From Swiss-Prot:
Active site: 282 (proton acceptor)
Protein name stated in the entry: Homocitrate synthase
Record pathway: Amino-acid biosynthesis; L-lysine biosynthesis via AAA pathway; L-alpha-aminoadipate from 2-oxoglutarate: step 1/5
Broad class of enzyme this protein falls into: transferase
Domain Pyruvate carboxyltransferase: 1-251
Pfam families linked: HCS_D2, HMGL-like
Binding-site positions, Mg(2+): 9, 188, 190
Function: Catalyzes the aldol-type condensation of 2-oxoglutarate with acetyl-CoA to yield homocitrate. Carries out the first step of the alpha-aminoadipate (AAA) lysine biosynthesis pathway.
SUPFAM superfamilies: Aldolase
Residues reported to bind 2-oxoglutarate: 8, 68, 128, 162
Molecular function terms from GO: homocitrate synthase activity; metal ion binding
EC number: 2.3.3.14
Amino acid sequence: MVLDSTLREGEQTPGVNYTPEQRLEIAIALDEVGVDFIEIGHPAVSEDVFRGMKLIAEQGLNVELLAHSRALIEDIDYVLKTGVDWVGIFFCLSEACLRKRFRITLDHALEKISRAIEYAKDHGLKVRFTPEDTTRTEWANLKRAIRLAKELKVDRISVADTTGSTHPLRFYTLVKKIVNFGIPVNVHCHNDLGLALANAIMGIEAGATLVDATVNGLGERAGIVDLAQIITVLYYHYGIKKYRLDLLYRVSNLVSEITGISPQPNYPIVGENAFTHKAGLHVSAVLKDPRFYEFLPAEVFGRERTIYVDRYAGKDTIRYYLEKFGIRDHGIVTSLLRKVKSSREPFTWEKLLEEARRVKE
């Protein structure tokens, strides 16, 4: 399963602040993709965030809705007012956090967590508990917290690689140990070392049943797992076909337009160049069968394949465009290719058509 956190983790990207209407528009688009959960925000942040969350909860979407919350009764009261069914309660339990951030003992922290979970449960909420910075928290502390969560009938535990620095094999081992407690496990993997997707996959292999992601990999610092990538991994490697791959590019563009942040051109699945072919040998092969250089066809993602034209082009590149232009004189291929290869600038299709007409004359 997939939880999308574009509206919570994604909004922690510097420069990103959604209006209530934008929050709703993104939630509707994610519901159409078919994600299982949407983390729609942290209602205690501001009145604007709260209003947007309430607006989403009133829509009757098919997806499960979850609100983020500190282990505070007042935060949970905000969550209850939004009308969602799930609350995600988090608290850091590492010795460093307990001593330096909170200046409390582990016993005190567990009492605080227990009060928050019991309050949420007593008020009808389903609870996901996240020991923040799970991967760097001492196992003795984690074990006590997870046992407490099980006693309190927490619905899900989230394993958070908060600094995005854990080695995938170590992440696998940790998730496996936590899965053995018998509580359904989420994984929340940051991308500070570029390991978010690898860690998410290792989490799945270890028995986690839900992965957190955001559109375009938005989030604090280097962000978290990208939604399009994890959904495609689930489809391609695990045979999970319930998500709308053909809508991933559209939702990426929607979020880019709203946030003003676009993926890098070479970004997988949704980047501008993800299905662009340049080298002549590649183009020649792709025109025969896209599977030579595409693991899935561009059309699966609602995209079009692009053939790029510059000095790396080959004759098949030129023939491809001549046919698109309706020019059947293949005798000009060599002359036109010579023109392309002598230029330091790429050729747009308009420029190529103009040059083809000139050469043909």
